[in-house]
Amino acid sequence: MSIQDNLTINEKKVLLALEEIGSASPERLEEKSGLQVDAAMQAAFMLEEKGLVSVSEKMLERYSLTKEGTEYTKTGLPERQIIDFLKKPTSLEELRGHFSPKMVGIATGWLVKKGWAKIENGVMVPSGKVNAGKDEETLAAFTGKAKTLEEIGSDQGTIKDLLKRKLVIKHEEKFRTVSITDAGNALATQGLVLEEEIAQLTPELLKSGAWKDKKFRPYRLDITPKSLYGAKIHPYRRLIEQMRQIFLEMGFAEIKGGIIQSSFWNFDALFQPQDHPARDMQDTFHLNSTCELPTEYFEKVAAMHEHGGDIDSCGWGGAWDKELSRRNVLRTHTTSVTVKYLADHPKSPVKAFCIDRAYRRETIDPTHTPEFEQLEGVVMDKNMSFADLLGLLAEFYHRMGFEEVRFRPGYFPYTEPSVEPEVYVDGLGWVELGGAGVFRREVSEPLGIKDPVLAWGLGVSRLAMLKLGLKDLRLLYQSDIDWLRKSEVCRT
């Protein structure tokens, strides 16, 4: 297909017009081509992509009078009005009797700056007859529409002063020039046939049979179209919403809690010992503040830690430190939210989940960040069992698209029995995605909870890495536009 065959009729009209005049403004091109200015410029830009014309742009500055500037063209600038009034040295007080104090104030500075007068002991002394200044000539040159500096015969210094005085205003206009290139000129001289072409086969053309006598515009199927990047939800946010929707469909209530928690709810209520490495292993962000402990629970929790309370448990032994429990931290897991919710709702049945951010002092690398999302959930009912927990988690992962799910024994301070759910991923094998179990009586008893509680905490970011095929967790939080554009909207 020749270049000429690939030109639309509008492109040909523009090219022929430019062959005659060489270059033109959009308005001149409209006149010579017979096209509307928008259609002419659209054709010009298409010709530019083909190398047949060039489109240059420059900013053109024009100026017009403000309302105040227009008024001064009739009455004269404040300094001109006062200098014309001055026939002899006159006190400023007397001037304020003839002119407004505001005008006298404005004029005084400009009279001195221009050398038209001087101030001696509160008296304005004229310097003699003065000719019109450049600024006055510039104001007088304004008539009608906005003008350039050249059109009003002014200079940058004068116009700058008038802008500062808010007597004129600047308008910036984009000025385009379309010029034919050597390649475009060579093509135009070969002769361009102006023939109407049909770009779309419509039902009307088919019904009437008129398509038989029409020439259709040829299409090139070998050209790759430009990529279009429409707006879409961030892939990580989309996965979080998918998880949220799954639990809502399973009848769970979503709960929220503060990111600042006391050590009591973050550690002690979950039966994590105060002098055990379990706390240090969390790499906690400790805050320089404390809070009051819940009076209805802390003594029972303290007794559970020290000697096992009123149940068949030995506790952790040692003395429980109330002040240590009052210290605030950035929550290291969202379990602090769910256990607090259970304390407020100790009666069965309860089905609640929380998808929110947790914080740990981690070194940033491809698999760790100091901030991460966690999916926490609890189910409390007198008929619940460990088998129900496994079935519930398996159902969740199946709905997330993982066909094979298994569970391995695990250990957590606040659940027994405990498991770690794993899913099978091609190329990676079995991947662990969190922890789960049944709350120990050491956790539930001090809070007044009598029925079994199934609990789990699942790693959202790790699951997202598997679903999105990422090897670097940091991509989920970075503004990598190329990755975001190429990310899948959905997977079937």
Swiss-Prot record:
Q: Which residues cross the membrane?
A: none
**Listed GO cellular component terms?**
cytoplasm
Where is L-phenylalanine bound in this sequence?
T335, Q374, L375, E376, Y414, F439
Query: Where can this protein be found?
Result: Cytoplasm
The protein's Enzyme Commission number: 6.1.1.20
User: Which molecular function term from Gene Ontology is one that the record holds?
Assistant: magnesium ion binding
Output the PROSITE patterns linked to this UniProt entry. AA_TRNA_LIGASE_II
Keywords recorded for this protein, A-Z? Aminoacyl-tRNA synthetase, ATP-binding, Cytoplasm, Ligase, Magnesium, Metal-binding, Nucleotide-binding, Protein biosynthesis
Q: Which GO terms describe its biological process?
A: phenylalanyl-tRNA aminoacylation
**Which reaction equation describes what this protein catalyses?**
tRNA(Phe) + L-phenylalanine + ATP = L-phenylalanyl-tRNA(Phe) + AMP + diphosphate + H(+)
Q: Which family does it belong to?
A: Belongs to the class-II aminoacyl-tRNA synthetase family. Phe-tRNA synthetase alpha subunit type 2 subfamily.
Please give the PANTHER family that the UniProt record associates with this protein.
Answer: PHENYLALANINE--TRNA LIGASE ALPHA SUBUNIT, PHENYLALANYL-TRNA SYNTHETASE
Protein known as: Phenylalanine--tRNA ligase alpha subunit
What are the top taxonomic ranks of the organism?
A: Archaea, Methanobacteriati, Methanobacteriota, Stenosarchaea group, Methanomicrobia
